[in-house]
């Protein structure tokens, strides 16, 4: 009834005149109302609205960070994780190890006829974790030597013990009835040589290294009566002599010997009498101090068997506790949710394992297995972290830019995308320590520097980068000195100069490393301005300080000063930017806002010039202001002689000044720490002995023209490298002697010639006198000698250069103490600094020949230049080798424990024997570091592709990776990455993920595109260059100021090309003739096709434009990185974690290197867990509640269960649908039939009536 009423009213409305319009309006109002209602509903649920439609809220927090992000680009996080306690994983590890052993067994069978014994497994390296535990130069022999063996008899029994200084017996702590022998040595090198010599022999005795400790609670210790530990002194003491001079009188009188161990902050004392310990212990209680610090004396205990108390770095047993997971991933995810909530999704790459606490129902987290990302599934299973990392960019659905983390890496402070990448400066690259040297004694800066270095002349260093190929390379060690080069203040055994010498202010310190925001040890020297402030301001007093004043713009640097720095503390709060005039005297200039200083490092020996600076500062009100200053500099410095002696001789035409001895300062560096290593030869051996060459001393100006011309020719041949120095001396001596024999001018002969024999007799009264002088560092050897008043001629006798007048009578084996003062003149004021007295060997005194360059034998140059230093006026700091400590070995636990390292070392040795088919006794074997070897391997590949340069290793921290860049890298080196993917365990020929990625990003070059240059110049985008645009192009390819010839020359090139090139290339016919008009009517329309195909113009453009980096990047320091290697020393771990608490960093890595079998392992893990809970106590959305855990811990189990669940769900739905349909048909059969008849009515068929039939 109601339906009929509604139907009648509808028809009435539609039949009305305006009914149709009213209905249309009603429909529109209804639709608008519906949209408005929907909008209100969405506003009520604003957070869900933004999650669905706002890209700024597409992150794990579901909040908008629009005011903090530079762009709404989605950024995902990728983790690599493994559960080391999984039994299935441990079984697979054991299988891989057995497979490697079988392969090596087969290799030994091949070598059976040439191998006397299999290669020994690497010895376990034990680490002492006791308090103040130090390794001392002692060897412990078990069982003890016979009681009648004395120190003199010891070398006859063990020849390697010839350097032993003492021997005594002690009783075993656990078995006092038996003794062990303790052999004492003077140095670490002696004890290591003796230890290795004893291991090579067939001794039946077990040999141990000796340790001393103050921890008396550990069993197996022996108290040393005459030894004691001194602690509590300030940590600033780094040298033994420094501490010895500060000891109180009552303490030093009872000490026979003292040895400082600065790394452990203790000193070992050898007492005169064992009873002195009690007296000293009482005296320390009376507040005996050094610099306000109270001293503590502790007894010293000897131990040698570390197996019960130490951490094994190379344990061979597999156990679940060894690779135990400390749930670092849980806390790393908490750090992301707290400090980086802008992350979109999180992907966890595993070998199929699932964390028991992970909430798999969270849509923001996804487990990715190796099968999902590896292209070649035959490479699986893999246990190599580089192999896994090389495939993570192939994760499906991953953002273009993603952040890669290991589970032991977390965020300590708020982190934003611009900490990794910014549009203005590009990728931010965090670098740490340098790449290990390619060979022993060959720093990276030596490769391809124009000199052939013996240490680098091997395949590992690519034959010195080509310097040793042919005769193009010169010698780094030139006996006669560098005629054209200058001696910098680098290492005293290396002459400066060479092709790229200006790129390095010190050996191993490139100019690009200065002011790079982290302290480089090689740059922390005076010649580099102490790394331009990166290493702190402790040494700023050694630099020349200039204070910038608000009303002063002109400053004058004293002559000879090349390392000034400017303090702007009185002018501004911080520096914003700065620019300086292009001047060849400048090596480096930078602003250090931390110290409010401007550092200027200049090349020495340069003429006077003026440098202009344009600086932008910020005052205390954060207002920017500009400041222009001019600085007058002159880095030349004249010689400063301590004493000279001049004596005129009758026979000389010109006076001769005695060559002063240069003031030489040495640092007392132990011989075993000196670098590089070189082999010494006996100077009296027949191989090194050379025939004495006597060159007459002549006044060149008195010689005939033909003789002078011949000498000049010899000088040119030597300078060009056509002859060696030895050949030069022989030729010059023969030429002068032949002239003397044939000369009829006796007067000239008597006046101009003094032979070496007469020279010796003349200086006999002054043989014992030593003359000292300070020559400027910045001058070359030849330049320094030019300032003296005599012609210098150098001769070589028995491999040593001898000065001709007068030879200093110093024995080559003498050792003496040099007490010197360093004088530094600044603006007329002389300041003196007295360094500690040093014991140095002086084996020969040599003088350099003026303007002599050449190449000499490798053995001679290595020894002479390593031992003979002249003109070095600064005390060079002890060179610390570029090394890496606590390096990152991989995210997999078996890589941290070096589980496969022994097998890899043995495989390397066997492969070497197979390659050369030699006897294993003659095959030297050296344990290798796989991680360091792989860095060298990648560095060698990068050198071959992008050129030789010094590189550093990226920090172990989160890295932002671009999928496109990573794919380009792998497309460039497909074989290398495929080999990396093939390796089952970490290998020395792996492509290191971060190292290869970032150096490809920093080295990739974008080839110059002429079309882009044309588009830049074509400012009106007309496709044809106008006169004004042609002038712009001319300024880009010519030096300023632009001359008329430059402009007309460019136009003539274009005119000639338009006449020579075909019309279909220049496309001049397609250009309207009135589009551009030129001053020169002969100039055709300058189109893009004309410019790009005109070779003279393109050559000019290529010459003016340099290839640009394909990707922008910025080198960052280590200020925001905290890398801690967690070991089993509880007190050390607590100190490390407290340092992070006090100084939070953005990027924190706690690398687990805990020995889980150690007695203190559970304590360390508890301390670590407490630290995690204190930093991140709030559970993240990715965790299950504490009372729940995942049912499945492997993806294959989960996938099987999901497949079974889906199948069961499908059949359940089918059955349910069948039941519903059956129920409907059973109860509503009549209604369904009626509905069917109503929807599909049956049509009735009416038959026609028969025509013959008559209706009645």
Curated annotation (Swiss-Prot):
The record gives the effect of mutating residue 374 to L as: In MLII and MLIIIA; no effect on protein abundance; no effect on localization to the Golgi; loss of UDP-N-acetylglucosamine-lysosomal-enzyme N-acetylglucosaminephosphotransferase activity
Q: Name one GO cellular component term.
A: Golgi membrane
| Pfam family membership, one | DMAP_binding
First-tier enzyme category under EC:
transferase
The reported effect of residue 956 to Y is: In MLIIIA; no effect on protein abundance; no effect on localization to the Golgi
Tell me what effect the entry lists for residue 407 to A.
Answer: In MLIIIA; no effect on protein abundance; no effect on localization to the Golgi; no effect on protein cleavage into alpha and beta subunits; decreased UDP-N-acetylglucosamine-lysosomal-enzyme N-acetylglucosaminephosphotransferase activity
Query: Which consequence is recorded for altering residue 785 to W?
Result: Found in a patient with mucolipidosis type II or III; uncertain significance; no effect on localization to the Golgi; loss of UDP-N-acetylglucosamine-lysosomal-enzyme N-acetylglucosaminephosphotransferase activity toward some substrates
* Enzyme Commission designation: 2.7.8.17
Effect upon mutating residue 592 to T: Found in a patient with mucolipidosis type II or III; uncertain significance; decreased localization to the Golgi; decreased UDP-N-acetylglucosamine-lysosomal-enzyme N-acetylglucosaminephosphotransferase activity
Q: How is it modified after translation?
A: The alpha- and beta-subunits are generated by a proteolytic cleavage by MBTPS1 protease at the Lys-928-Asp-929 bond.
Q: Which CDD domains match?
A: RRM1_GNPTAB, RRM2_GNPTAB
UniProt note on tissues of expression: Expressed in the heart, whole brain, placenta, lung, liver, skeletal muscle, kidney and pancreas.
Phenotypic consequence of residue 1018 to G: In MLIIIA; uncertain significance; patients with intermediate phenotype between MLII and MLIIIA; no effect on protein abundance; decreased localization to the Golgi; loss of UDP-N-acetylglucosamine-lysosomal-enzyme N-acetylglucosaminephosphotransferase activity
Instruction: Cite the effect that the entry attributes to residue 955 to V.
Output: In MLII; uncertain significance; no effect on protein abundance; no effect on localization to the Golgi; decreased UDP-N-acetylglucosamine-lysosomal-enzyme N-acetylglucosaminephosphotransferase activity
Q: Which UniProt keywords apply?
A: Calcium, Disease variant, Disulfide bond, Glycoprotein, Golgi apparatus, Membrane, Metal-binding, Mucolipidosis, Repeat, Signal-anchor, Transferase, Transmembrane, Transmembrane helix
The answer on whether this UniProt entry bears the keyword Transmembrane reads yes
Which residue spans traverse the membrane? 22-42, 1215-1235
Reactions accelerated catalytically = N(4)-[alpha-D-mannosyl-(1->2)-alpha-D-mannosyl-(glycan)]-L-asparaginyl-[protein] + UDP-N-acetyl-alpha-D-glucosamine = N(4)-[6-(N-acetyl-alpha-D-glucosaminyl-1-phospho)-alpha-D-mannosyl-(1->2)-alpha-D-mannosyl-(glycan)]-L-asparaginyl-[protein] + UMP + H(+)
Domain EF-hand per the UniProt entry, residue ranges: 1005-1040
Any one GO molecular-function label of the UniProt entry: UDP-N-acetylglucosamine-lysosomal-enzyme N-acetylglucosaminephosphotransferase activity
So what does mutating residue 468 to S actually do?
In MLIIIA; patients with intermediate phenotype between MLII and MLIIIA; no effect on protein abundance; no effect on localization to the Golgi; no effect on protein cleavage into alpha and beta subunits; loss of UDP-N-acetylglucosamine-lysosomal-enzyme N-acetylglucosaminephosphotransferase activity toward some substrates
* Binding positions (Ca(2+)): 449, 464, 467, 516, 531, 534, 1018, 1020, 1022, 1029
Q: How does it assemble?
A: Hexamer of two alpha, two beta and two gamma (GNPTG) subunits; disulfide-linked. The alpha and/or the beta subunits of the enzyme constitute the catalytic subunits. Interacts with LYSET; facilitates proper localization of GNPTAB.
The protein's name: N-acetylglucosamine-1-phosphotransferase subunits alpha/beta
Q: Which organism is it from?
A: Homo sapiens
């Amino acid at each position: 009834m109601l339906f009929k009423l509604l139907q009648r009213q509808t028809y009435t409305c539609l039949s009305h005149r305006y009914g149709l319009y009213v209905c249309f309006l009603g429909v529109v109002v209804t639709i608008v109302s519906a949209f408005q209602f929907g909008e209100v509903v969405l506003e009520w649920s604003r957070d869900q609205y933004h999650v669905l439609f706002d890209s700024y809220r597409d992150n794990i927090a579901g909040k908008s960070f629009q005011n903090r992000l530079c762009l709404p680009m989605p950024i995902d996080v990728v983790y690599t994780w493994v559960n080391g306690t999984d039994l299935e994983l441990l079984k697979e590890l054991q299988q891989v190890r057995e497979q490697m052993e079988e392969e090596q067994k087969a290799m030994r069978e091949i070598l059976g006829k040439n191998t006397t014994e299999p290669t020994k497994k690497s010895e376990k390296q034990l680490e002492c974790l006791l308090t103040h535990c130090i390794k001392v130069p002692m060897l412990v022999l078990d069982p003890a030597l016979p009681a009648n063996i004395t120190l003199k008899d010891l070398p006859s029994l063990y020849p390697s013990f010839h350097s032993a200084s003492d021997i005594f017996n002690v009783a075993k702590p656990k078995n006092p009835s038996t003794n062990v022998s303790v052999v004492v040595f003077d140095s670490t090198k002696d004890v290591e040589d003796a230890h290795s010599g004893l291991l090579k022999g067939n001794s039946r005795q077990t040999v141990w290294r000796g340790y001393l400790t103050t921890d008396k609670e550990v069993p197996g210790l022996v108290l040393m009566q005459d030894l004691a530990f001194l602690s509590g002194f300030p940590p600033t003491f780094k040298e033994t002599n420094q501490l010895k001079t500060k000891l109180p009188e009552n303490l030093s009188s009872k000490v026979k010997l003292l040895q400082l161990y600065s790394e452990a902050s203790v000193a070992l004392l050898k007492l005169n009498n064992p009873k002195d310990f009690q007296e000293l212990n009482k005296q320390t209680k009376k507040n005996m101090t050094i610099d306000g610090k109270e001293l503590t004396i502790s007894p010293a205990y000897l131990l040698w068997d570390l197996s019960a108390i130490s951490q094994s770095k190379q344990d061979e047993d597999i156990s679940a506790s060894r690779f135990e997971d400390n749930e670092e991933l849980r806390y790393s995810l908490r750090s992301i949710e707290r400090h980086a909530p802008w992350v979109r999704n999180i992907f966890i790459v595993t070998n199929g394992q699932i964390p028991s606490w992970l909430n798999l129902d969270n849509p923001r987290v996804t487990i990715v297995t190796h099968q999902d990302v590896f292209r070649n599934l035959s490479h699986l299973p893999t246990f190599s972290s580089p192999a896994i990392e090389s495939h993570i960019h192939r994760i499906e659905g991953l953002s273009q830019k993603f952040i890669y983390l290991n589970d032991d890496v977390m965020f300590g402070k708020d982190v934003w995308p611009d900490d990794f990448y910014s549009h203005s400066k590009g990728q931010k690259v965090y670098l740490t320590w340098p790449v290990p040297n390619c060979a022993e004694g060959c720093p990276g800066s030596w490769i391809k520097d124009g000199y052939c270095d013996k240490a680098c002349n091997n395949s590992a260093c690519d034959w010195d980068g080509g310097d040793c190929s042919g005769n193009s390379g010169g010698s780094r060690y030139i006996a006669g000195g560098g005629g054209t080069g200058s001696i910098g203040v680098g290492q005293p055994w290396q002459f400066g100069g060479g092709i790229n010498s200006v790129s390095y202010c010190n050996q191993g310190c490139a100019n690009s490393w200065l002011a790079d925001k982290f302290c480089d040890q090689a740059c922390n020297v005076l010649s580099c301005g102490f790394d331009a402030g990166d290493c702190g301001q402790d040494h700023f007093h050694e630099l020349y300080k200039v204070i910038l004043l608000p009303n002063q713009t002109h400053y004058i640097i004293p002559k000879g000063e090349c390392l000034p720095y400017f303090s702007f503390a009185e002018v501004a709060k911080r520096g914003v930017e700065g620019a300086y005039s292009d001047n060849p005297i400048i090596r480096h200039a930078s602003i250090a806002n931390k110290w409010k200083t401007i550092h200027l490092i200049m090349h020495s020996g340069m003429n006077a010039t003026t440098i202009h600076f344009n600086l932008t500062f910020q005052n205390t009100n954060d207002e920017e202001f500009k400041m222009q200053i001019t600085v007058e500099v002159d880095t030349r410095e004249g010689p400063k002689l301590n004493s000279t002696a001049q004596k005129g001789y009758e026979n000389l035409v010109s006076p001769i000044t005695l060559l002063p001895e240069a003031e030489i300062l040495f640092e007392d560096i132990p011989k075993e720490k000196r670098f590089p290593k070189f082999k010494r030869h006996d100077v009296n051996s027949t191989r090194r002995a050379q025939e004495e060459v006597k060159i007459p001393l002549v006044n060149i100006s008195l010689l005939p023209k033909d003789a002078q011309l011949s000498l000049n020719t010899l000088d040119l041949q030597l300078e060009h490298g056509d002859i060696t120095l030895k050949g030069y001396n022989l030729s010059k001596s023969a030429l002068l002697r032949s002239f003397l024999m044939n000369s009829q001018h006796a007067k000239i002969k008597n006046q101009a010639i003094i032979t070496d024999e007469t020279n010796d007799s003349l200086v006999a009264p002054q043989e014992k006198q030593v003359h000292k002088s300070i020559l400027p560092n910045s001058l070359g050897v030849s330049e320094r000698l030019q300032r003296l008043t005599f012609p210098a001629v150098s001769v070589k006798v028995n491999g040593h250069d001898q000065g001709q007048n007068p030879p200093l009578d110093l024995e080559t084996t003498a050792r003496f103490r040099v007490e010197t003062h360093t004088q530094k003149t600044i603006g007329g004021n002389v300041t003196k600094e007295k360094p500690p007295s040093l014991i140095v060997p002086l084996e020969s005194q040599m003088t350099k020949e003026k303007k002599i360059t050449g190449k000499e034998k490798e053995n001679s140059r290595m020894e002479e230049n390593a031992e003979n230093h002249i003109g070095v006026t600064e005390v060079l700091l002890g060179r610390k080798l570029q090394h890496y400590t606590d390096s990152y070995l991989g995210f997999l636990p078996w890589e941290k424990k070096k589980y496969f390292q022994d097998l890899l070392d043995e495989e390397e040795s066997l492969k070497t024997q197979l390659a050369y088919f030699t006897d294993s006794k003659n095959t030297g074997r050296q344990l290798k570091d796989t991680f360091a070897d792989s860095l060298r391997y990648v560095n060698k590949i990068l050198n071959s592709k992008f050129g030789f340069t010094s590189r550093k290793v990226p920090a172990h921290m989160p890295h932002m990776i671009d999928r496109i860049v990573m794919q380009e890298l792998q497309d460039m080196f497909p074989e290398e990455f495929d080999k990396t993917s093939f390796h089952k365990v970490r290998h020395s020929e792996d492509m290191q993920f971060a190292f290869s990625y970032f150096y490809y990003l920093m080295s990739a070059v974008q080839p110059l595109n002429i079309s882009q240059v044309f588009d830049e110049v074509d400012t009106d985008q007309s496709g044809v260059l106008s006169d004004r645009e042609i002038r712009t192009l001319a300024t880009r390819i010519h030096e300023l100021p632009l001359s008329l010839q430059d402009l007309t020359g460019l136009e003539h090139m274009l005119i000639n090309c338009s006449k020579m090139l075909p019309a279909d290339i220049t496309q001049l016919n397609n250009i309207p003739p009135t589009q551009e008009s030129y001053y020169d009517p002969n100039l055709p329309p300058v189109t893009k096709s004309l410019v790009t195909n005109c070779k003279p113009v393109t050559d000019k453009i290529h010459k003016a434009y340099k290839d640009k980096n394909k990707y922008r990047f910025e080198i960052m320091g280590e200020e925001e990185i905290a890398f801690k290697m967690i070991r089993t020393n509880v007190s050390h771990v607590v100190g490390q974690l407290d340092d992070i608490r006090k100084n939070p960093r953005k990027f924190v890595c706690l690398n687990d290197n805990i020995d889980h079998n150690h007695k203190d392992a559970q304590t360390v893990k508890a301390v670590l867990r407490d630290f995690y809970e204190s930093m991140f106590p709030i559970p993240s959305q990715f965790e299950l509640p504490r009372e729940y855990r995942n049912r499945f811990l492997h993806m294959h189990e989960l996938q099987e269960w999901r497949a079974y669940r889906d199948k069961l769900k499908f059949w359940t739905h089918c059955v349910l649908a069948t039941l519903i349909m059956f129920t409907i048909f059973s109860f509503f059969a009549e209604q369904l039939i009626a509905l069917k008849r109503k929807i599909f009515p049956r049509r009735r068929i009416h038959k026609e009536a028969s025509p013959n039939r008559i209706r009645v």
